[in-house]
């Protein structure tokens, strides 16, 4: 299953994605997100969180979304790749 990076303060999102079978890694810096299909961050700007992502990696901004909504977006991203 796809590897998904999740900012450490989003434990409900981590649990949702693990229940869907995704490999979840906590991201605290740009190295943590390498090799991930996409990353989920809590704010609008990943750079503010100290996380920069390489190339065309998808970023999901968790602000205002439920864990279930984020899980659906991850499903869409993974099926497109």
From Swiss-Prot:
Record-stated family: Belongs to the UPF0180 family.
Identification of the protein by name: UPF0180 protein ABC2430
Organism (species): Shouchella clausii (strain KSM-K16)
Lineage: Bacteria, Bacillati, Bacillota, Bacilli, Bacillales
